[in-house]
């Protein structure tokens, strides 16, 4: 039996006086964290770094919690997404043009509070968001 399709990405956050803000990307009507499929021979952390750079232009990320991650339950044709925590101080994001699509992969981005992210993200990402909030807030 074939295993799950592996994807990897990052919960990108920045610290503000009002608490952490999480980078969300919208493609059509769906909000998500930056992520993509793991290439053959690529480890998942390298995939996460590559996908964040491809989808947001961010390359100055710090991974303050190292290789700690959370995964989604299988969804959409047995895909499992692994997320790492990545910190940035950058506020403005550029949505680069995808060479395959000839346009940006996403339509907009938003820096969201925990409550805003909880409302915008699909239910499958709730455990990932909650883990990020607990970890980043230190509780």
Residue ranges and their predicted role:
Residues 5, 69-97, 110, 132-136:
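Active-site-adjacent beta-strand/loop module that shapes the phosphate/pyrophosphate-binding cleft
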Residues 17-18, 30-31, 39, 85-93:
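Short, charged/polar surface micro-motifs in flexible loops or helix N-caps
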């Amino acid at each position: 039996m074939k295993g799950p399709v592996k994807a990897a990405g990052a919960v990108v956050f920045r610290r503000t006086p009002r608490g952490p803000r999480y980078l969300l990307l919208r493609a059509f009507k769906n909000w998500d964290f930056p992520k993509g499929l793991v290439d053959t021979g690529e480890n998942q952390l390298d995939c996460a770094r590559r996908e964040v750079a491809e989808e947001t232009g961010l390359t100055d990320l710090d991974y303050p919690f190292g290789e700690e991650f959370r995964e989604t339950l299988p969804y959409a044709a047995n895909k499992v997404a692994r997320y790492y925590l990545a910190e940035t101080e950058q506020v403005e994001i550029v949505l680069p043009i995808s060479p395959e699509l000839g346009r940006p992969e996403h339509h907009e981005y938003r820096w969201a509070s925990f409550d805003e992210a909880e409302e915008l993200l699909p239910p499958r990402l709730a455990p990932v968001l909650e883990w990020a909030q607990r970890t980043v807030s230190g509780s």
